[in-house]
From Swiss-Prot:
One of its GO terms (biological process) is translation. Keywords: Ribonucleoprotein, Ribosomal protein. It comes from Bacillus cytotoxicus (strain DSM 22905 / CIP 110041 / 391-98 / NVH 391-98). It holds the Pfam family Ribosomal_L12_N. Disulfide bonds: none annotated. Belongs to the bacterial ribosomal protein bL12 family. The keyword Ribonucleoprotein applies. The keyword DNA damage does not apply. It comes from the Bacteria. This is Large ribosomal subunit protein bL12.
C-alpha cells in the first residue's frame, strides 16, 4: 500500500473509525497520541491568557433536528453518533478550539435554539 493510498483511506474514515485507528496504533507501537504537557514556570509569573476552549452543548432545546445537523457539521460525526451526543447533554462537542472558533460554534448552535457553554 502506498502512502497516498493510506492517506485516501484515512480521509474516508469517520471520526469513530479514526479514534479506533489511533488506539490500535498506540497499542501496536507502544506510543501515545497525547500532546506533551507544558510545565508552567514559577508562581511569580503572570498567568497566560487562555488560548484553548471547550464548547459544551448544555441543552439541545426544542429544535433537536436542527441542532443535530449543526453538530454533524461541526464534528463530522455520523447521524447516529450526533443524535446520541445531542440526546445525552451536557456533552463537550469540541475540545481545544481557538476563542474565535469556539464563539463561532456557540453562535451556530444558539441560532438553532441550543444552550451552549464555552469553557
Amino acid at each position: 500500500m502506498t502512502k497516498e493510498q493510506i492517506i485516501e483511506a484515512v480521509k474516508s474514515m469517520t471520526v469513530l473509525e479514526l479514534n479506533d485507528l489511533v488506539k490500535a496504533i498506540e497499542e501496536e507501537f507502544g506510543v501515545t497520541a497525547a500532546a506533551p504537557v507544558a510545565v508552567v514556570g514559577g508562581a511569580g509569573e503572570a498567568a497566560a491568557e487562555k488560548t484553548e476552549f471547550d464548547v459544551e452543548l448544555a441543552n439541545a432545546g426544542a429544535q433537536k433536528i436542527k441542532v443535530i445537523k449543526v453538530v454533524r457539521e461541526i464534528t463530522g460525526l455520523g447521524l447516529k453518533e450526533a443524535k446520541e451526543l445531542v440526546d445525552n447533554t451536557p456533552k463537550v462537542i469540541k475540545e481545544g478550539a481557538s476563542k474565535e472558533e469556539a464563539e463561532e460554534i456557540k453562535a451556530k448552535l444558539e441560532e438553532v435554539g441550543a444552550a451552549v457553554e464555552v469553557k
